[in-house]
Amino acid sequence: MKNIFLHSLTLENYRNFKNLELKTDNTPIILIGENGSGKTNILEAISLFYPGRGLRSAKLADICKASEDQCLVKALLQSKLGLAEFTTQFKRSSNRRITEYNESKIANNELSKFTSMVWLTPQMEGIFTSGSSDRRKFLDRIVYNFDSKHAELVSKYEYYMYERNKILAEDIRDDNWLKIIEEKMADMSSHIANNRLKTLEFMQQAIDELENEFPKADLSIDGIVEQKILDGKENIVNFITAELYQTRSKDKLLGRTSFGVHKSDFLVKHQKKNILAKFCSTGEQKAILIAIILAEMNYAIKLTKIAPILLLDEVFVHLDDKRRGYLIEFFTGLNMQLWVTATDLEGIENFANKAQLIKLPIIL
């Protein structure tokens, strides 16, 4: 098994940190500090070495330290391709982000070729009651760990969708170019939908096989394209192309693309109660979310032979002793780099004995 882990992390003008340098190894790491000390900021900085905008989905302008125009995150990381240096820089004035791998520029969506990462934060606990976009992005992040090309597919699909919307809005009479764009979107849609379905099959198997202290869930996706594939629809690309063509007038009026894989919803049911997670209690929703993360970790390692970096923000809070103990045993048994935030060590004393402790002062 190959482990993805950080050897070092450097922050410059990042959030509340002027300068911070951490040296780490392939072990559990506990960030200890009061609220406001920057624990979650460190996890967010690490998450930027994975496709997307990090675990907060923050705007670039919010990431740089107040009064500073630019900031930097640098990591020496044991990647899928070996030891490498990664940097990501932000410039507030130009609203630009530049990411580099061994001093060569790479696209953000290429990061899944090098890294693998899973995170769980308090903000995610509302994912079952929020909009479908949040759940869909959550599912796609899971897919990244099974298929490193998925992030690039999603990014390109969104780009061509933007181009299509622009052509329709500006009334550019170029049917040829519009046809090419829609054909590209259809081809990518087919791959995206198939990747999601394949990953859900893996995940469901992992959930059903893994016996733990958390409720089992039934996973599915509510989307026209995905359902057509499940129904055995032939020539799915032609079907999508035809739908995009037929909705041109409607989409011109709406100012957006009304059909496609960007409209799909990730559905989660409490298996025993047979009700959607959004109708469960907040405690049950958190437990179901943890169960999904456990399944993702377990099956990603089993299938890809790669252990991702795991980021857990205040996850042990409000868990009973039994569930807390199970999580600690599960995660330490995986022999991977795990980052945990906590205000104190109460309830995780035994875990702390096996971890690297990093104490953070409050930075005023």
From Swiss-Prot:
The RecF protein is involved in DNA metabolism; it is required for DNA replication and normal SOS inducibility. RecF binds preferentially to single-stranded, linear DNA. It also seems to bind ATP. Transmembrane segments: none annotated. It is found in: Cytoplasm. GO terms for molecular function: ATP binding; single-stranded DNA binding. This is DNA replication and repair protein RecF. Its main location: cytoplasm. GO terms for cellular component: cytoplasm. One of its GO terms (biological process) is double-strand break repair. InterPro entries: DNA-binding_RecF, DNA-binding_RecF_CS, P-loop_NTPase, RecF/RecN/SMC_N, RecF_2. The keyword Nucleotide-binding applies. Keywords: ATP-binding, Cytoplasm, DNA damage, DNA repair, DNA replication, DNA-binding, Nucleotide-binding, SOS response. ATP binds at G33, E34, N35, G36, S37, G38, K39, T40. Belongs to the RecF family.
